[in-house]
Regions:
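Hydrophobic transmembrane alpha-helices and immediately adjacent juxtamembrane helices
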Residues: 1-292
Length: 292
């Protein structure tokens, strides 16, 4: 933690900034993070540069990735498996779920290796370590904005062709839902990042785990499909990503299963994951250079 000090000592003995170790379990200086907002912006720009450096299509992959995935979902789950889509066009159904899920998955995957991939930088200069994962989720937020714009273009096409889709009042909740998804991704990501300093296997397992998590979420199937399997439906509802996905579909397609229990549970889980993640991150950052 850094703090500004005003002293009357001679210039050769004066310090403008003193770095002291953190002592509390939840010792996060929000004012300090705000003072380093320019650094966060620089990290966001760097993330884009590193991600698409030496690629032929560059940032076009932001659009191509979810678009290709949606087409595959539509062919495999909609065509071959003939899964229901609650009466809305399958392409939009899968794109809606995939857009929300991709945002969450990017937040988790991009923050999961914060300590390991930035150990050299952390060992050379001081700055709030939490700026790194924050910059990663902000990068994911920008990607989501671009993908959401693409989704709206396809939505407009299907709306114009009389597909029966419509926006509902739930659309007003979308900014808050996406904020929740971002905070959940940040919380889970920094938990994994903190644990990978000692258990490197997690860095490999997190990608696989996120993929499995997707199939436990109503991305390729509607929650209503599980009405005849009450126990399985309850298990899926215990997934904190179920409520955000269903709300997004309800908001933009007019179909979905939104419950008070699902909303409250998802919010509580997100808050718990974020608090636990920040506490763990704060404790690990003191000693991670000895284990990385």
């Amino acid at each position: 933690m850094a703090e500004n000090l005003q002293t009357t000592r001679p210039a050769e003995e004066s310090w403008t900034t003193v770095i002291r170790p953190k002592t509390g379990w939840f010792d996060i200086d929000l004012n300090e993070l705000w003072r380093y907002r320019d650094l966060i912006t620089m990290f966001v720009k760097r993330n884009f540069t590193v991600l698409y450096k030496q690629t032929i299509l560059g940032p076009a992959w932001i659009i191509l990735n979810p678009l290709i995935t949606t087409i595959i979902f539509n062919v495999v789950f909609g065509g071959m498996a003939n899964m229901p889509t609650d009466g809305v066009p399958g392409f939009l159904f899968y794109m809606a779920g995939n857009t929300v899920w991709t945002f969450f998955a990017n937040c988790v995957n991009n923050t999961a290796n914060t300590f390991v991939t930035n150990s050299q930088v952390f060992g050379k200069v001081y700055f709030p370590r939490l700026t790194m994962p924050i910059s990663q989720v902000l990068t994911s937020l920008i990607n989501f904005g671009i993908q959401a714009a693409m989704y709206l273009i396809f939505w407009g096409y299907f709306f114009a062709t009389g597909s029966g889709i419509t926006f509902t009042l739930w659309a007003l909740a979308i900014p808050f839902v996406m904020l929740e998804v971002m905070l959940l991704g940040l919380g889970v990501g920094i938990i994994v990042s903190s644990l990978t300093t000692k258990y490197r296997d997690l860095a490999i397992a997190v990608g696989f785990g996120v993929q499995l998590w997707m199939y436990a979420s109503p991305v390729v199937y509607p929650l209503s499909m599980l009405d005849n399997s009450p126990r399985l439906k309850v298990l899926v509802q215990l997934n904190p990503m179920t409520s955000p996905i269903e709300i997004f579909r309800m908001a933009t397609l007019g179909t979905g299963t939104v419950t008070v229990f699902g909303i409250v549970y998802s919010l509580i889980f997100t808050a718990a994951a974020l608090v636990f993640g920040v506490v763990l991150f704060s404790r690990i950052e003191k000693t991670f250079m000895d284990t990385v």
